[in-house]
UniProtKB/Swiss-Prot annotation:
Name under which the protein is recorded: Cytochrome c oxidase assembly protein COX18, mitochondrial
Membrane topology qualifier: Multi-pass membrane protein
Gene designation per UniProt: COX18
Segments on the Mitochondrial matrix side according to the record's topology features: 230-272
Coiled coil: none
Protein's job: Required for the insertion of integral membrane proteins into the mitochondrial inner membrane. Essential for the activity and assembly of cytochrome c oxidase.
GO cellular component, one term: mitochondrial inner membrane
Predominant place of localization: mitochondrion
Keyword Transmembrane: yes
GO molecular function, one term: membrane insertase activity
TM stretches of this protein: 209-229, 273-293
Source organism (scientific name): Kluyveromyces lactis (strain ATCC 8585 / CBS 2359 / DSM 70799 / NBRC 1267 / NRRL Y-1140 / WM37) (Yeast)
Family according to the record: Belongs to the OXA1/ALB3/YidC family.
Length: 313
């Protein structure tokens, strides 16, 4: 009896994973049958609804938080110059004292040891810059905590949005494992002439579990165009706001750390978009439609957020 139960326990986790994906596929099938809406309308509508319920509130929350962070960063921008001036003044004063003590005719042993210790406490320009930046980050952290806009909260949106996208993609992939023809659209009779069929009838006869064989590059081109527009728009926004985001370094300097980070993110995003275009050539029509709709929603959402809560320039 014990030996018979072991395989079921061993595969329990895997079966739960496949069961959750099957539940998503079954939910779409039930929604399709109950509503009578065609698949090509149901998937975009469901995508907009899911993004509006789960990611839009988090996106608004994050946008407001980032704008507040930029405002607070402008407040602490005055800290490094003041700290640099104070540290430089202390260093110069220590140097003057060192010159005064070394100019005496006779120095005791205690005076010599004290002079050596003061020399160790003197700061170089690089150390002064590092200490001023450290003080700025310390005060910035205190301000962020005071206004409840801590940096770790910026990771909440990706932790929700990415798993949602992956889960939906896998669920639709499970849905299109077998042949999927839309029963909520008109179909042509077997003996009907092809010239007499309308475009709705032609779409209704498509197998949505396969790529679009009639125009194999149409969907990848649409997906790639929308994705690249989204990437370049976000990249332009990131580069324009890098000055307010960093506080010290500027994105116009190609050698700055901020500029290199922004360029690295944009390069990785462009490469992932190209990879997604290649995958869409072999993906089902339904899955590619979900990806296109998600990209369109992101583009519209970012435009609206930029109008309502623009980043600080």
């Amino acid at each position: 009896m014990l030996l018979r139960r072991l395989p079921a326990v061993h595969f329990a986790k895997g079966s739960r994973q496949f069961g959750s994906l099957q539940a998503i596929a079954d939910s779409f099938v039930q929604l399709h049958d109950a509503s009578g809406v065609p698949w090509l309308v149901l998937i975009p509508t469901a995508t907009f609804a899911l993004r509006t319920v789960f990611t839009l509130p988090l996106s608004i929350w994050q946008r407001k938080r980032i704008v507040k962070q930029q405002e607070l960063r402008k407040v602490v921008q005055s800290v490094p110059p003041v700290v640099k001036l104070r540290l430089a003044s202390m260093t110069a004063k220590a140097n003057d004292e060192e010159l005064t003590s070394s100019g005496s005719a006779i120095q005791t042993k205690e005076e010599t040891v004290g002079a050596l210790q003061r020399g160790k406490r003197q700061l170089t320009p690089d150390q002064i810059t590092m200490l001023s930046l450290k003080e700025m980050r310390k005060r910035q952290k205190v301000l962020f905590k005071k206004y409840n806009v801590q940096m770790w909260k910026n990771s909440v949106l990706p932790l929700v949005q990415v798993p949602l996208w992956v889960t939906m993609s896998m669920g639709l992939r499970k849905l299109t494992d077998s042949r999927l023809v839309d029963t909520n659209m008109p179909h042509a009779h077997v003996l009907q002439d092809l010239s007499e069929t309308s475009w709705l009838t032609h779409i209704g006869s498509l197998d949505l579990s396969l790529p679009l064989d009639a125009a194999p590059m149409l969907i990848p081109i649409i997906l790639g165009t929308v994705s690249m527009i989204n990437v370049e728009y976000n990249g332009k926004t990131m580069q324009a706001t890098a000055v307010g985001t960093s506080g010290i370094t500027t994105a116009t300097d190609t050698q700055s750390r901020t500029s290199q980070t922004v360029n690295s993110i944009l390069t990785a995003t462009r490469l992932s978009t190209i990879f997604l275009i290649g995958v869409s050539t072999q993906a089902s029509v339904l899955l590619s439609l979900y990806w296109i709709t998600s990209q369109v929603y992101s583009l519209i959402q970012n435009r609206i957020l930029d109008l309502l809560w623009p980043y600080q320039r």
